[in-house]
Amino acid sequence: MCRYEHTIAITNRTLVQGDFLEQMKKVIHLHPHAVILREKDLPDDAYSALAEKILSLCEREGVRCFLHSRVLIARNLGCRRIHLSIPALETMSEAERFELQRNFEEISVSCHSLEDVNIAVKNGATQIILGTIFETDCKKGLKGKGIGFVEAICKTCPIPVYAIGGINLERLPQVRKAGAAGGCMMSGFMQLVKN
């Protein structure tokens, strides 16, 4: 059993010391459940070039890769997995949501409440990224919603839930016990030093 099989690696190249692609090779080689290529600050052309490389690395290792919000880039690159925010999903027309479900086999959605989860599920989400569970350096001062929140959502959610926010390998068993399929890690993967 892989130590990282219940984790999703969320990218943030600004946290990486050294070469981002080399770091991603290490991360992908660990076989997490998936990678979400975040990099929200990149312009489309740079994101597309990076996505092509990450998709290739993931494909070679048999790891799922979700592109973050860039629906057209994902379609152009033949990527059938997309990650969206609730606001992005809600602002889509009915026709756009239909196309989304037609063009993507997996749709991941960030949620912060039961209402968000219901919207995501109704609109074809296949997995939920639920946060923020524990306080984290990425969102200093934002109090985590805790394990009880994970448990409450997982009791009613018909699709896999992955917790985010302060998740590490030590906390992973807690969120799994609460009903989550796993957890998302950003700094844990971006600052990983071993091979």
Q: What are the residue ranges of the model-derived segments?
A:
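Active-site mouth loops of central-metabolism enzymes
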Residues: 3-21, 105-111
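Structural preference for beta-strand elements that scaffold enzyme active sites
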Residues: 6-8, 33-36, 64-66, 80-83, ...
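Conserved, mostly hydrophobic/aromatic
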Residues: 9, 27, 35, 74, ...
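Glycine-rich phosphate-binding active-site loops on the catalytic face of alpha/beta enzymes
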Residues: 9-13, 82-95, 127-141, 167-195
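Short, acidic/polar
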Residues: 14-28, 69-72, 112-119, 168-173
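Structural motif
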Residues: 30, 77, 123, 156, ...
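Alpha-helix-loop-beta-strand connector modules within alpha/beta enzyme cores
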Residues: 48-67, 94-113, 143-168
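Histidine/lysine/aspartate-rich catalytic loop segments that bind and position anionic ligands
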Residues: 107-135
